[in-house]
Swiss-Prot record:
It catalyses: isopentenyl diphosphate + 2 oxidized [2Fe-2S]-[ferredoxin] + H2O = (2E)-4-hydroxy-3-methylbut-2-enyl diphosphate + 2 reduced [2Fe-2S]-[ferredoxin] + 2 H(+); dimethylallyl diphosphate + 2 oxidized [2Fe-2S]-[ferredoxin] + H2O = (2E)-4-hydroxy-3-methylbut-2-enyl diphosphate + 2 reduced [2Fe-2S]-[ferredoxin] + 2 H(+). This is 4-hydroxy-3-methylbut-2-enyl diphosphate reductase. Belongs to the IspH family. The keyword Lyase does not apply. The gene is ispH. Its cofactor is [4Fe-4S] cluster. Keywords: 4Fe-4S, Iron, Iron-sulfur, Isoprene biosynthesis, Metal-binding, Oxidoreductase. Catalyzes the conversion of 1-hydroxy-2-methyl-2-(E)-butenyl 4-diphosphate (HMBPP) into a mixture of isopentenyl diphosphate (IPP) and dimethylallyl diphosphate (DMAPP). Acts in the terminal step of the DOXP/MEP pathway for isoprenoid precursor biosynthesis.
Length: 316
């Protein structure tokens, strides 16, 4: 059985930065460190940080006075940010800079009195944070997930209308929704480049190339990871058997029985150690050496806050 690896796969710059912020805060300040929501959507990462003293909470009221609080990579609403400011807390922001870019787009629209439409998945923390940047009572902020949502939507003023997108969506699905928005509201204004981040786009391109060769595609990522789910869905749309797995233990032997080629990729919040474990398990099931496919090179780095720029080895 041939094993192919998608390229790129795994951690993106925003996830790297968010995890480093929590790790460095633990190294500098010691446990406990409070993190609002899972810092990234990966069970292995969250469990590892929890073992080292990170406490993951959903409400600011759960954080004691004087504590260290970190916002997750998904971002938070202005209401959450203001609540944290009103408390005696030291706050570090691990929001991905590409999510912050979308927040700024919404805030500008709010200041101008433009109504805004966000393309995204209801209930996702990134969507909640982005929707929460809009505060103009004279305007309006709306969420759509599909072209059907667009055709049902009524706004106050079609002349002053803009749209934004969640950063981890399906490129193909989002294109369909944007097309519907432009037909429904001809004067709508969008970002010069859509808000889907480079890592989401690159990993979807990579899984498309992977699925062209592999009979079965394994996507390493947690069930609550939006970008990981989109990778599995894309492979399935291409007619391949695709499975979203947290780790190697989730692999069922019948998935790869009599399969000649299996492909492996990982969502942007999944560490490479999990991919290595998946490859090792596939090799136990008869797989050969893992062959990485060619793909886009990624060299983007997002700096951590200057207060947390430390060599952890020196602290240890």
């Amino acid at each position: 059985m041939q094993i192919l690896l998608a390229n790129p796969r795994g951690f993106c710059a925003g996830v790297d930065r968010a995890i480093s912020i929590v790790e460095n805060a633990l190294a500098i300040y010691g446990a406990p460190i409070y993190v609002r929501h899972e810092v990234v959507h990966n069970r292995y990462v969250v469990d590892s940080l929890r073992e080292r003293g990170a406490i993951f909470i959903e409400q600011i009221s759960e954080v004691p006075d004087g504590a260290i609080l970190i916002f997750s990579a998904h971002g938070v609403s202005q209401a959450v940010r203001n609540e944290a400011k009103s408390r005696d807390l030291t706050v570090f922001d691990a929001t991905c800079p590409l999510v912050t870019k979308v927040h700024m787009e919404v805030a500008r629209a709010s200041r101008r009195g433009e109504e805004s439409i966000l393309i995204g998945h209801a209930g996702h923390p990134e969507v909640e944070g982005t929707m929460g940047q809009y505060s103009n009572p004279e305007g309006g902020m709306y969420l759509v997930e599909s072209p059907d949502d667009v055709w049902k939507l009524t706004v106050k003023n079609e002349e002053k209308l803009s749209f934004m997108t969640q950063t981890t969506l399906s490129v193909d699905d989002t294109s369909d929704v944007i097309d519907a928005l432009r037909k429904r509201f001809p004067k709508i204004v969008g970002p010069r480049k859509d808000d889907i981040c480079y890592a989401t786009t690159n990993r979807q391109e990579a899984v498309r190339a992977l699925a062209e060769q592999a009979e079965v595609v394994l996507v390493v990522g947690s069930k609550n990871s939006s970008n990981s789910n989109r990778l599995a869905e894309l492979a399935q749309r291409m007619g391949k058997s695709a499975f979203l797995i947290d780790d190697a233990k989730d692999i069922q032997e019948e998935w790869v029985k009599e399969v000649k080629c299996v492909g492996v990729t990982a969502g942007a919040s999944a560490p490479d150690i999990l991919v290595q474990n998946v490859v090792a398990r596939l090799q136990q099931l008869g797989g050969g050496e893992a062959i990485p496919l060619e793909g886009r090179e990624e060299n983007i780095v997002f700096e951590v806050p200057k207060e947390l720029r430390v060599d952890i080895r020196e602290v240890d």
